């Protein structure tokens, strides 16, 4: 009898434990919600229904002209999925309803006969390679609501060729999406551009200098990929985002300054910059991605406003050995100096001449000038990117004229 009572008590206790376990109860609704997702077809189109939207996922390969509905089963069509129309070689015309906000990567890529696309009035995002290699695509009007354009979205289209013929710096809604038709060694990006699009300058092998306006806030993935001769570029202070591979294989780049707003250096952002020697980081980094500095054998000096403890706390991805070899200058003062005022005294005098002459002489015999990045910038009077005898001459002339009572500005001299 005692054994029977103990057995019954154990069974009842086990059942009570199972019934009272809160994590068992939600499993069924989660499973049911996943199963509730619907797919179906309407005309030549295949769709998926979510709780708040319909997504176009595929199209019949034999379709020639397609008009996508604005609503399916009472839900608005908000999205065209990745690869939905990829390589539809018979497709010639598409009308996309105004409900659509996003067209994903490769959605219409390699539609070789596609000639006209009517984009929605309130479109926000055009994915990477969205219309790439649609060789006959000529009629396309990108609405002003578009804020995100993935890399190579229009590569290989007749539309892009027309735009390049009008201006080799192709802009859409203040995004510079393509500069591949440029042949100049120096390119000045016009004011008002807010983003350098992904791969916009890629493989411009003749490019030596890029001047970016203060309006730029983002440099897209692969923006300067394989610009082998790029030597000079100043990243504007307003930039907050530099995406992966932005400066990948910029072999001639020797130094670069990262503005304070940038907090992450993503994967391979400076990979294979074989001659990169000096890096100035004005802000506080929260992450350095995998291989961000791989194959940068000459990286020797890094100036940062961060403390040693904060620097060592940064999560660093694999393949960043050059960071371990470089000398890190912690808590570096990176204040802006007046032109030629290397001692930050507020005036230009013989002391500044001494510092400039000493630095030029040390550089001439292969030694480091000993200047901070701010001092080097202040010593480059003519803005040539190098401090030399010309800059020394300008400083001496500036001091001599002002000492003689002849009011002289740098604009009068340079």
Segments (PLM) and residue ranges:
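Gram-positive cell-envelope targeting signals
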Residues: 1-36, 342, 356, 395
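Hydrophobic residues embedded in beta-strands of well-ordered beta-sheets
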Residues: 16, 52-55, 176
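Cellulosome-associated attachment modules in secreted, modular CAZymes
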Residues: 20-26, 333-414
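Low-complexity, acidic Ser/Thr/Pro-rich repeat tracts that form intrinsically disordered stalk/linker regions
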Residues: 24-46, 50-51, 62
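Structural signature of tandem-repeat unit edges
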Residues: 44-52, 61-78, 89-102, 110-125, ...
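Consensus positions within tandem repeat domains that build extended binding/scaffold surfaces
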Residues: 82-84, 104-107, 127-130, 151-153, ...
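Ser/Thr/Pro-rich low-complexity tandem-repeat tracts
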Residues: 86, 109, 132-135, 202, ...
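A structural signal for leucine-rich repeat
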Residues: 294, 315-319
């Amino acid at each position: 009898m005692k054994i029977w009572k103990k057995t019954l008590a154990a069974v009842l206790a086990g059942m009570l434990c199972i019934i009272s376990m809160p994590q068992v109860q939600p499993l069924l609704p989660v499973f049911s919600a996943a199963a509730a997702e619907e797919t179906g077809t309407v005309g030549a189109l295949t769709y998926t229904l979510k709780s708040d939207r319909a997504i176009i996922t595929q199209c019949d390969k034999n379709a020639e002209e397609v008009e996508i509905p604005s609503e399916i089963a009472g839900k608005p069509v908000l999205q065209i999925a990745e690869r939905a129309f990829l390589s539809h070689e018979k497709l010639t015309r598409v009308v996309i309803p105004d409900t659509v906000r996003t067209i994903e990567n490769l959605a219409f890529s390699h539609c070789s006969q596609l000639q006209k696309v009517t984009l929605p009035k309130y479109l926000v995002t055009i994915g990477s390679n969205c219309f790439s290699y649609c060789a006959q695509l000529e009629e396309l009007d990108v609405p002003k609501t578009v804020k995100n354009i993935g890399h190579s979205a229009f590569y290989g289209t007749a539309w892009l060729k027309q735009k390049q013929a009008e201006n080799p710096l192709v802009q859409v809604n203040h995004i510079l999406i393509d500069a591949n038709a440029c042949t100049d060694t120096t390119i000045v990006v016009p004011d008002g551009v807010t983003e350098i699009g992904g791969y916009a300058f890629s493989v411009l092998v003749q490019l030596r200098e890029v001047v970016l306006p203060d309006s730029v806030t983002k440099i897209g993935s692969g923006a300067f990929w394989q610009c082998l001769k790029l030597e000079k570029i100043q990243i504007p202070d307003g930039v907050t985002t530099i995406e992966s591979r932005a400066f990948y294989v910029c072999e001639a780049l020797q130094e670069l300054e990262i503005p304070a707003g940038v907090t992450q250096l993503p994967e391979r952002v400076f990979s294979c910059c074989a001659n990169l020697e000096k890096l100035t980081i004005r802000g506080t980094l929260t992450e350095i991605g995998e291989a961000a500095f791989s194959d940068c054998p000459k990286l020797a000096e890094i100036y940062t406003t961060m403390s040693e403890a904060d620097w060592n706390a940064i999560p660093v991805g694999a393949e960043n050995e050059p960071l371990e070899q470089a000398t890190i200058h912690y808590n570096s003062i990176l204040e802006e100096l007046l032109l030629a005022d290397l001692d930050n005294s507020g005036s230009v005098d013989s002391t500044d001449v001494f510092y400039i002459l000493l630095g030029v002489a040390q550089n001439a015999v292969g030694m480091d000038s000993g200047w901070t990045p701010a001092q080097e910038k202040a010593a480059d009077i003519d803005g040539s990117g190098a401090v030399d005898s010309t800059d020394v001459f300008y400083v001496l002339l500036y001091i001599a004229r002002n000492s003689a009572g002849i009011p002289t500005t740098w604009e009068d001299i340079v």
